[in-house]
Amino acid sequence: PESWCAEAFDEEKIKSDSIVNRNMDIYTEDIRLLTPNARFILFDACFNGSFHLDDNIVGSYIFNKGKTIATMGCTVNTIQDKWPDEFLGLLAAGMRIGQFTRFTCFLENHLIGDPTFHFTNNAGLDMDINQALVAQEGNVTFWKKQLNSPMADMQAMALRQLSMANYSGLVELLKKSYHESNYFVVRLEALRLLALNYPTEVADVLQTAMNDSYELIRRYAVEYVEKNCNPELLPAWIESYLLRGHENRHRFRIFSAINTFDHDMALNELKKQAADWSFYDSSYVNELLEYLPRQKKGLERDFALIDSPESTTKQIQSEISRFRNKPIAKAIEPLLNIIKNESQEEELRILAAETLGWYNLYYNKADIIKELNTFRTSNQKLMNEVTKTINRLKSQNR
């Protein structure tokens, strides 16, 4: 209504609105008027750790009359669905903030303050956790014993340490830990280590994890399914949507992964499973039924644009780059064809090779490595990128 805008340019109204807006947020000037008593602050939002700016939130806590010793925050944006408090429970066991950062740091996440700071060990852990993390690194016998620790975070750390030590029985241990542990931090650690390092063996755990009782595990599981692309996961993926489609964040992850599986197979599986259900409100099912065919057509257009001789280099670059964040199985063959095409522009061939390096969680990445290992070209820049991609696909994740 026009009445809403009547006072839009009134000086008093502008002043009043600005005060309301100012009071809705916390600014560095507000913090400097306080005396913060928190020794360590973990910020889980964008820009709070922007130490490269003259004025920033983390600095306002550190350079203050208060008692804050260390902070952790992001310089720009925070990635979604991360696990920022992984191993946080070990702070109660006296783990140094620097060690906490070493095991949990994400891109653009920074520790500002004293990394040697630690709290008093009041968790009942009968060891120096900081000494163990350094002196016992690689000691399989020691960390296997910690699997029986009364602390859930210590059990999770034991799994991480055994992974770092390349323990020979790790895959079965991780599966056992996921299926049998009552602690969500242990289950999530097991799931992550399996999905990140053993994509060919993780299918059975992912099938279960998409309906885990802990919401973050469910969301991580759907994200890993998107990167794994194993067609065996399709029935469980559809079932998770029928069970959890009413959850906004779970639904968002499902729709983000809409191109993971063959669209026709996914549509048939959805119809098959939905036929056995009784719905109070089936609108969310109908939404996916309508979305799958639309996305199929959209993906076909994308591939047609890549193959079209009329497409510009910039257009093809844009399409190829999408498969870095969305490494779907259907894009592998087109990317390999671009790499092998000697008449194709060099920058597109290099980009295609680099993009395949993002398939490090793909269940059948061994086939990609095999294809790239047999590839030969006189173009040294392209060959260097192919070699880097092979190394990316073979590398171990933390």
What are these regions (language model features)?
Residues 150-151, 182-183, 213-214, 245-247, ...:
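Short inter-helical turns and helix N-cap capping residues of alpha-solenoid HEAT/ARM repeat scaffolds
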Residues 1-85:
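Catalytic cores of nucleophile-dependent amide-cleaving enzymes
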Residues 144-148, 156-160, 175-179, 188-192, ...:
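Amphipathic alpha-helical repeat scaffolds
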Residues 84-168, 187-189:
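Caspase-like cysteine protease fold
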Residues 131-132, 155-165, 185-197, 218-230, ...:
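Structural detector for internal amphipathic alpha-helices that build alpha-solenoid repeat scaffolds
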Residues 59-68, 85-110, 201, 214-217, ...:
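C-terminal, active-site-flanking charged/polar segments
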Residues 136-146, 167-178, 199-210, 230-242, ...:
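Amphipathic alpha-helical scaffolding segments comprising HEAT/armadillo-like alpha-solenoid repeats
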Residues 44-47, 73-76, 104, 115, ...:
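Active-site proximal loops enriched in glycine and acidic residues that flank catalytic Cys/His/Asp
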